[in-house]
């Protein structure tokens, strides 16, 4: 029997809200008068720049989506708690959970959070069309974007005594600006004076086009390479917004006080002895020392902080695409607040 999945279903907010409240009450997941507050549970959405054309198979990083939902004040529209069963059938068509805004469809984003078994959980989502996403949930949060025209089956492990299933809607854009390739030889290299000499008060940088994801830092006593979680771009049109400490300078030649950069930068290493760099408590890069004369890394940290701090501030203000797909370590997870 043929299934008509690709029909367009208009989204009726009022009907959706009535069914949503009624279903929650009848299923005894929650029986509280506060759930009759219509405004609180109205479906809200945000626009995500999406660089994957096959949105039906994409898994987005849940931390990123959580940040977006929090910042954009999006309410999660389904919340199944204190589960008595572990398989949920949610039919987006039957429940009118397919929404259109103009020519764009709002895609449901599914979160599975607060599961009791945490890093032992497996989440399986299967649609009528056979699109199947299975992931070992090691961070207790899992998010999936699925095709809104199909019903899906969500399975949680039998050992799970409770779980929370959250569904919200996001408008995905697949027409973002193509990524500009780096200019030939356009690799960012910082050369510092002797490590025993005074660090200069300002650093001048000039960026044209795209910088690839590698930064080399050189001094007389050590060298290191830093791999950014994402390339940085310099895309027209001008002018662009830049950080407050650089606002008095032009876009082409930026002068940044060193001490404004190193105060929020921390270098740490994990159990595997891999060095990472954090800016404002966000992991933004992994780096490797080589040709290092001293075994103990001391003052070199300051050079690393300066170099990467500059790049990070510029990158934050030059990124046009804010969503990376299927990359849990993409730089997009490291966007900082506007006031940095």
From Swiss-Prot:
Domain of life: Viruses
Pfam family, one: DUF1231
UniProt-listed InterPro entries: Vaccinia_virus_B17 (IPR009633)
Family label: Belongs to the orthopoxvirus B17 protein family.
This protein's name: Protein B17
Biological source species: Variola virus (isolate Human/India/Ind3/1967)
